[in-house]
Structure formats: structure tokens, C-alpha cells
Amino acid sequence: MLTKQQDAYGRIVWDHLHGRPLREIVERDDGWFDTSSAAPRYFAEFRHWPPHQRAVMKYVCGRVLDVGCGAGRCCLYLQKRGQPVVGIDASPLAIQTCRERGVKDARVLPFTRIHRGLGQFDTILMMGNNFGLFGGRARARWLLRRLRALTSPNARIVAESNAVYQTKNPDHLRYHRFNRRRGRMSGQLRIRVRYHRYCTPWFDYLMVSPDEMKAIVAGTGWRVQRFLKSSGSTYVAIIEKDGRKRGG
């Protein structure tokens, strides 16, 4: 669990909830950093979501595990639809924010610590580029196998990522080469988030092309069924369990 000083992301969403202006800093391990006011989109209502995110929600069925639930926007939308949903996040303050906003079942739990005690799910939801929480190729394949044990026979994973090779930014292209030289995937970011005096530990966040995603998923008991594109480099994958019945 993140300590109070490490929970920079949680402090960002908590402060936004309470009307405090903010700027977050994302720092990468090659020295690159960026600042943004991203918090409003963590709170956006469904009608303000990007079109591709709205479109994929028709694939979100049954009992849902929202991985990296943040401020709870997906949980709240699914609750309004009448679906049971459990939101998990490594950030204690993000979970506190979810609860204050009305999320019924929000738990402080890192993705790597998911367990059978959570119950069985029909959809694993990973929006907001949260395929990135798989971290890297090996950990992704390990977690995908774990997810098989937590999901129903006709389960799906609905996961958003960013096709990193579409960039023309020389800093990002240089980072891709830097990663490949040290045996990492091009889009395997090593980052941390800063906000005022708060700073997360360094963590891996994985962005992949559609072909890379297919290769990661292959042989784990899941398969990519389709991709839904956005107007930019982000996209959503519908990943189905091997042996899933059509129409289920």
C-alpha cells in the first residue's frame, strides 16, 4: 500500500474533488517530464467520455472488476446501469475519493494482489490506458493467467492502451530506443507521479501496439477478439477467454 507521502495520484483526485487547483507532474526515468491538469477527465460523466470509450461499454457485461478505478467514473456509470462492480486501486486516497462520490464497493488493492476472495467476474475493465498496469510482458502474462481463475467461462477483458509507435516526438522515439537497448519493450515506461511534496515510487507502465498486445495475450488462455480505435493513438481491445461461447 502507498504511504501518505507516496500517494501523489490520490492527492490529485482528492484535491480536485474538493475544488483545489492543481498541476500534476509525470517524470520518466530518462529525465523527461510533463505537467498536466488531467484530473477533470478522471471525474467526467459518461456523456463527456471520448466516443471510443462510450462505444466499448456495450461489451462490459455482468459483474465487473474495474482495475485502477481512480476517482470512480466507470464504477459510478456502471452502478447507474444496475451492474455490480468492484473498483480496485493502489491509491488509498483515490479509493476514499470513490467512496465519497458514491462508489459502493471500492477497495485499496494493487493489481498484482488480486485474489479469489474478490469473487468471480464477468468483465475485467481497464480504461484510461490501464492495460499499462500490466507493467511488462512477463508480468502481463502472469496476471492474465491469474485473471482466468477469477473470471466466469464467458468472461472478457476490456482494456485501453496507446499505440506508442504513432508518435513523431523525438524524445519519445529516443526513449523507445533506450528501452530496447536495455531489453525492455519500447513502450514499457518507467515513471513516477509528483504533486506538491507527494511523489509515487517508480513503477512500470506498459503501452503497446495492437500487434504487441496480441503477442502478449497469446497462450495465456485469452485472445484478442477485436480492437476499437479512437481518433488518436489510443484504442480499446476486447479480449475474450479461450473457449468463450459466441453470443455469450
Enumerate the language-model features and the residues they cover.
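N-terminal auxiliary segments of SAM/dcSAM-dependent transferases
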Residues: M1-E27
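SAM-dependent methyltransferase
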Residues: R11-D15, S152-K214, A218
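Conserved alpha-helix/loop element of class I SAM-dependent methyltransferases that forms part
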Residues: F43-R63
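Class I SAM-dependent methyltransferase "Motif I" SAM/SAH-binding loop
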Residues: G68-G72
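Conserved SAM/SAH-binding beta-strand->alpha-helix loop
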Residues: S91-P92
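Conserved SAM-binding strand-loop segment of SAM-dependent methyltransferases
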Residues: G102-R113
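A short SAM/SAH-binding and catalytic strip from SAM-dependent methyltransferases
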Residues: F121-R141
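A short glycine-rich, Lys/Arg-flanked "PGG" loop and its adjoining helix->strand segment in the class I
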Residues: A140-P153
